[in-house]
Amino acid sequence: MVATDISRAVQGLSGVPVTVEVDVANGLPSFTIVGLTGRAIQEARERVRAAVRNAGFDFPQRRVTVNLAPAEVPKEGSGFDLAIAVALLRTWRELPLDDVACIGELALDGGVRGVIGVLPMARRLAASGIRRLIVPGENAAEAALVEGTEVIGVESLAVAVAYLEGRVDLAPVAAPPMGEVGASGGVDLAAIRSQALAKRALEIAAAGRHNLLMLGPPGAGKTMLARALAGLLPDLDADEALEVASLYSLRGRLSDRPATSLRPPFRAPHHSVSRAGLIGGGAGIVQPGEVSLAQPSVGLSHMRLGAQRRDLRAHHHGPRHPASDEAERCTLLQRFLFGFGTHPGHPVSAAGPWPGRGPAPAP
C-alpha cells in the first residue's frame, strides 16, 4: 500500500513542496529512503523507527520504501521526520491529509522537536495551496505569522496522529500581532553628544540609503553612531518584516530578534568574519550571511578594510563560471545599508596602497 504526505525542501528563502510517499510491501524487513537525500534524512530511518514504536504504534515488519519527490531536488535536514512517520502510519490507519503538511524532527521517545527555517517553509507551502500545517510546538508561533494558514502545534507524534484521526481537538495557534517591540540595536541620536558633522552624515545616509565610511580612532564612537543610524530608519512594513524574520528563522537566530518586530535589524560582525559568514553559503541548507541578516537596514564592519572590501567585491561580481558548470544556484536577499568603521592608519582611499597587495585595484 502507498500513502503520501507533504513537507518541504529548503533552498534559500524559496523551496519546493516535497511529497512523501511510503510503500509497505511484502518482503524481508527493511527501511529505505530515496529521493536525493542528505545524511540527516538517511539517519531519519532510526529516529522514525524508534519514535513510532515508543509512541505506541507497531512498526511494520515488512519492506518499507520512502520516496521524497521530486527526486531531482536535494533535501537536507531533519524536518522531514514527522511527515515520514505520519505517511507511514497512514498505510494502515485512516489519517485525512488533504491540504495538510507536516514539519518537524522526531525524538526517539516519540516527541516532536523544533527545526530551523519553519517560517520560510510555511510561506512557501501556503503559496502552493497548503492550508493546514502541523509543526513542532516551539515553531508554531513563527509559522502562524503566515496569513491564510491554520497552524497546529504538537509536542509528540501520538498527539499529531490523534489530532488527524479526530480523537483530540487542537485549536489553531493564533498569530502574534506584528509590531512587538524587539531588540533592534538602535541608539537615540539625541543621546549622542557633540559629533554634529557625524550626525549630519548619518541623516543624509539614512535619507538616501547611502553607504557610510566612518574614520576615527578607537573609542571615537563609530559603533554608537552606526547603531544610531539604524534607529533613524523607518519601521519595516509587514512584508519586509516577514522577509527579515524568514532570514533569521533560516539561520536559527529568532532568539536574537522577535519575528514580530518591525524595527530594522542592525548587525555588527567581527572583523575576522569569514567570507561565508559575511555573504552566506554552505553545503546542504544554505545559510544567510551577515549582509543578508542586515537587510534592509544597517551592517557595520570594523577595520581590515582591504580584506572586507575584497570579499564584498568578489561577492558583487560573482564567480566567473559558465552556467553549465553550476550544479545549483541559490539567491539570498542582500539589500542593506553598509556602514564601515576603520582607524586612521588603515588605507581608505582607492588610490592608496593596500597591505601586502600593492596598488589598490580599480573600484
What are these regions (language model features)?
Residues E203, A259-F266, A276-G299:
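Conserved alpha-helical scaffold flanking the Walker A/P-loop in AAA+ ATPase domains
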Residues A25, G56-F59, E94-L95, A127, ...:
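Conserved catalytic network of the ASCE P-loop NTPase/AAA+ motor domain
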Residues L233, A238, E243-S246, L250, ...:
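AAA+ P-loop NTPase catalytic core and its hallmark functional loops
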Residues L213-P258:
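Walker A/P-loop
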Residues M1-L213, P217-M224, E326:
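Peripheral, non-AAA+ core regions of ATP-driven protein-machinery
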Residues L89, G280-I285, H321-A327:
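Short gly/ser/thr-rich secondary-structure transition/capping motifs
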Residues H270-S274, Q287-R320, L337, P347-P361:
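Conserved AAA+/SF3 P-loop NTPase catalytic/coupling segment centered on the Walker-B
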Residues G216, G280, H302:
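The Walker A (P-loop) glycine that initiates the GxxxxGKT/S ATP-binding motif of P-loop NTPases
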